[in-house]
Amino acid sequence: CPVAEEHFLVPAHEARGTQGEDQRPAGAASELELQEEGPKLGEERPKPEAGALEERGPRPVVSIVRPRHGPKRKPAK
């Protein structure tokens, strides 16, 4: 087990550097792709977006419901 932990820690530091470098160009590329797709979606359906904004305005804000993290535990006696 200690060998596996040491083996895991060393590549983790190396992987963090490579992941950070890989994520930045990938993130920039994905942002460019999203920007290219964004106008296309906007051109295809500008009316539903405008309608959605109009509908959201007068509606009251709904309270945020937090996701549950499993069933409630009974107190130990």
UniProtKB/Swiss-Prot annotation:
Biased composition (Basic and acidic residues): 1-24, 37-58
Pfam families recorded: DUF4691
Record InterPro entries: DUF4691
Bias type Basic residues, positions: 66-77
Disordered: annotated span: 1-77
Designated name of the protein: Uncharacterized protein C16orf86 homolog
Organism from which the protein derives: Macaca fascicularis
